[in-house]
Amino acid sequence: MSQVTTSYSYDAPTDFINFSSLTDEEDMQHIDSWFDEKANLENKFTGKDGTGGLYQGKTPLRKANLHRDVTPLRPVDNTYNKQAEKENLVEESIPSNECPSMKVKETTSRNNPVQPQRRSLRLSAKKNLEQKEKQHVKMKAKRCGTPVIINEFPPSKKMKVQKILKSTEEQELEKRMKMQQEVVEMRKRNEEFKKFALAGAGQPVKKSVSQVTKAVDFHFRTDERVKQHPKNQEEYKEVNFTSELRKHPPSPARVTKGCTIVMPFNLSQGKKRTFDETASTYVPLAQQVEAFHKRTPTRYHLRNRKDDIMPLPSKSVVRICRDPQTPVLQTKHRTRPVTCKSAADLEAEELEKQQQYKFKAQELDPRILEGGPILPKKPPVKPPTQPVGFDLEIEKRIQERESKKKLEEEHYEFHSRPCPTKILEDVVGVPEKKELPITVPKSPAFALKNRIRMPTKEDKEEEEPVMIRAQPVPYFGMPFKPQIPVGRTVEVCPFSFDSRDKERQLQKEKKIKELQKGEVPKFKAHPLPHFDTINLPEKKVKNTTQVEPFCLETDRRGALKAQTWKHQLDEELKQQKEAACFKARPNTVISQEPFVPKREKKSVIEGLSGSLVQEPFQLATEKRAKERQELEKRMAEVEALKAQQLEEARQQEEEQQKEELARLRKELVHKANPIRRYQGVEVKSSDQPLTVPVSPKFSTRFHC
């Protein structure tokens, strides 16, 4: 697969230089002549006199003596050819314990030379490219060869983990190194198994000595940061502020990394007391103070000035015997006030309450001294219950009906009255017939608008004059006396229940006295107590407080948070493992059409190297002006459309008014109807016979 055959053919121009045919000694100096000629042709332009001359303001693109300063262009090669070249360059980086299959692949790639690509490069650029790639591959092989130290503890959440993404080449090299190491380990295991199988069960087998664990130094991420210790910093110097405004501080020097000193982890511990500490043995305060002073270093203790002043050797210090005195302890002032009352205080309070209580004796009932059986008072005999009938409404209605019937049953006698004479003289009870006025014929009012004739004075009925009646003359025999309203003044009384409360209290006292007189208490003597045995109530001993551990909410939240944090770390590690796993994508480069450069069509002025061609531009004002014109045009069209619609509506309304006026005029013209002709009325005699009168047949059997 090192050599790829393509089915594409190109019709490219043949005016190019074949760099493979050139010799290194002859044409090394003139190797870039073709590029200089092209640059000189581009830099020529026609002057004022018509002659062509070099462009004075610009330097030529390339010079013959500047080969190494030009950055080499990378060829567009196939991935397989590129991989073959890199495998040739990695010879030195591959260790000697690689598998033979890898060597076979390398020999096949060496035997098949890479075909020269279509695009050409200068030899100087090609050499520089090869040297740089060799150095790059060596550095990568060294990095991959060094053992990778994986931190056992994942980084904390607050630390920012800088992920350095590796290229596909580095990932491939790492994968290859891992595979080589696995093959070497498998080979060693196979050899050991082979020796064990050949030796058999009877022969002693030499145990393979396991390699000693090599100590690996700790590699802290913080060592990569450049830090300056505060002790090593220079002393503060007074500097002029204005002169140092534009000066930037010098970059810190790269500190050489030394060996990391292995130190034990100093993990933070909470200062909260646990249950075991609180339940420890009791330690007196004096011992605690003494232990605290012993723990404190001597350099933190305050020294007494008297100790510094040494006594003179001439004077002898006389020791005086001192009497022991009790120390003035301050602990009694630190006692808390006792809120619970003692038993003596409680007994004193009960005694005071007993002394304050006054016994009120009741009056002596004289019947107790008189003697005889004391019987309870006989209750008063209540009168028998008198039955009271119900006063129902239905009974009232029945009584009213009976009374009405009695009134109706009264005997009625008929007394005739004289007949009025008016009945004989004239018609009585029939109203007089009103005489209607004779109808006066009048011509119809067709010419008027509403066809209604205005009423004339003759048509108006004569209104009857209103009769004015005089008021009766008042009687002046008695003088007029106006009625004076009686003054009713409401007296305001205070709202109080004093009188009613006093009456109730008197009634209550009276009732209590009656009850006391009625119920005489019976004397019952208590037996004499036995003083031999004293029965006291059992003393209630309270149970001691049971010590229980605190169930704090913070502990529960801490456990929950630790669980979630662990779950997040597991998820992050899983994602990192998935990201580190390499998955190759399918090779689509083989089936794709290769890149074909297209020649750009440029003018002579644009073809000049380094020339600045003014690109077309559009001002924002012009754009806004065009938009404004379009907006005004649209607004004018809308206004014209509105005016046209209004004009059409006005014309339509005028036509409707004209049609309505013509219709009204046509309706107002009178057209006389012809006289109607009716059929004559023929009087015919009736065919029915005359009514024969028949006397009624009255029956008297239903009469009472």
Curated annotation (Swiss-Prot):
Q: Which gene encodes it?
A: TPX2
Chief location: nucleus
Pfam families for this protein:
Aurora-A_bind, TPX2, TPX2_importin
Role played = Spindle assembly factor required for normal assembly of mitotic spindles. Required for normal assembly of microtubules during apoptosis. Required for chromatin and/or kinetochore dependent microtubule nucleation. Mediates AURKA localization to spindle microtubules. Activates AURKA by promoting its autophosphorylation at 'Thr-288' and protects this residue against dephosphorylation. TPX2 is inactivated upon binding to importin-alpha.
Question: What is the organism of origin for this protein?
Answer: Bos taurus
Protein name, entry field = Targeting protein for Xklp2
Q: Where is the composition biased (Polar residues)?
A: 109-118
Cite the InterPro entries for this sequence.
Aurora-A-bd (IPR015128), TPX2_C (IPR027329), TPX2_central_dom (IPR027330), TPX2_fam (IPR009675)
Where is this chain's protein located in or outside the cell? Nucleus; Cytoplasm, Cytoskeleton, Spindle; Cytoplasm, Cytoskeleton, Spindle pole
Q: Which GO biological-process labels does this protein carry?
A: apoptotic process; cell division; mitotic spindle assembly; regulation of mitotic spindle organization
Regarding protein family, the annotation reads: Belongs to the TPX2 family.
Recite the lineage of the species.
Answer: Eukaryota, Metazoa, Chordata, Craniata, Vertebrata
Q: Residues where Phosphothreonine occurs?
A: 59, 71, 146, 296, 326, 456
Q: Does the keyword Acetylation apply?
A: yes
**Which Gene Ontology CC terms are recorded?**
cytoplasm; microtubule; nucleus; spindle; spindle pole
